[in-house]
Amino acid sequence: MNGTEGPNFYVPFSNKTGVVRSPFEYPQYYLAEPWQFSMLAAYMFLLIVLGFPINFLTLYVTVQHKKLRTPLNYILLNLAVADLFMVFGGFTTTLYTSLHGYFVFGPTGCNVEGFFATLGGEIALWSLVVLAIERYVVVCKPMSNFRFGENHAIMGVAFTWVMALACAAPPLAGWSRYIPEGMQCSCGIDYYTLKPEVNNESFVIYMFVVHFTIPMIVIFFCYGQLVFTVKEAAAQQQESATTQKAEKEVTRMVIIMVIAFLICWVPYASVAFYIFTHQGSNFGPIFMTLPAFFAKSASIYNPVIYIMMNKQFRNCMLTTICCGKNPFAEEEGATTVSKTETSQVAPA
């Protein structure tokens, strides 16, 4: 084995020289230079400074402006709530541990940090699944003139939390476990060992199939169907240009969210899958640290995409920031998310 396994950790460093110590008790400076740990801390500080204000503002602006409280926006707000969970439950913890060079909060703190990081990532993934299904049902109309209403949105939000908890909670109950990963300053699912005592192998397979592969298949199917439908409707000019433009812009926004999610999380999932399927292989701590910390940036991009691509929300946010007066105010057109639940784009 090219790593060192302990009762509740796995350090990607051979202990032939006797230098490996528990990541819960000693600095891990044999894995990387102190300045590299400082860089991780600085990165986490940046995510906190950017992630908290932008996600909190997303929630606050929606509460302040009644016209933003639409069914589709419930799902988007769900992403902001999940991101705030990651900021408070994960990023602040990792910032502190990176400054110390090891996971100072012990196994219990590792469970908390790993749980919030996994929960936030899974809520984001399943929210994108719900958004993809909503776009498919509204635009492609497989169920005739289905209207995506408030009750559907609430059920969608509840569904994302149930599925996210079905992934994040089992390691706390003894099916798999959370352990420090990479440079041992943040925690995640144990992809490094089979650990038969906690049936780790079966959980990792379950997680990759149910909580990654299936959601990706659903998302790609929905958007594949949606692209064909929008092209057909545009070619046949079956609906007004205004309606088609509104649907296209909302769909474009959600697709960009999916692409951003893939950019952030696929490297982490790929590395985790490689480590799991190549037990005992030789890899350094940076190999898992970089994709893990890159995935954490997901807490920033969703609200940024939403603000940049939604004129109505952007105007409301500027109005809130500027104390009731928007210096860049424009006449609000029909291209707003608040209108999309009444889509009239015809199916192919």
UniProtKB/Swiss-Prot annotation:
A motif ('Ionic lock' involved in activated form stabilization) lies at residues 134-136. GO terms for molecular function: 11-cis retinal binding; G protein-coupled photoreceptor activity; metal ion binding. Residues 1-36, 97-110, 174-202, 275-286 are extracellular. It is found in: Membrane; Cell projection, Cilium, Photoreceptor outer segment. The keyword Glycoprotein applies. The modification N6-(retinylidene)lysine is found at K296. The modification N-acetylmethionine is found at M1. The record marks E113 as: Plays an important role in the conformation switch to the active conformation. Belongs to the G-protein coupled receptor 1 family. Opsin subfamily. Residues 62-73, 134-152, 225-252, 309-348 are cytoplasmic. Its main location: membrane. The modification Phosphoserine is found at S338, S343. This is Rhodopsin. It is a multi-pass membrane protein. It comes from Trichechus manatus (Caribbean manatee). InterPro entries: GPCR_opsins, GPCR_Rhodpsn, GPCR_Rhodpsn_7TM, Opsin, Retinal_BS, Rhodopsin, Rhodopsin_N. Glycans are attached at N2, N15. The modification Phosphothreonine is found at T335, T336, T340, T342. Phosphorylated on some or all of the serine and threonine residues present in the C-terminal region. Gene3D superfamilies: Rhodopsin 7-helix transmembrane proteins. SUPFAM superfamilies: Family A G protein-coupled receptor-like. Photoreceptor required for image-forming vision at low light intensity. Required for photoreceptor cell viability after birth. Light-induced isomerization of 11-cis to all-trans retinal triggers a conformational change that activates signaling via G-proteins. Subsequent receptor phosphorylation mediates displacement of the bound G-protein alpha subunit by the arrestin SAG and terminates signaling.
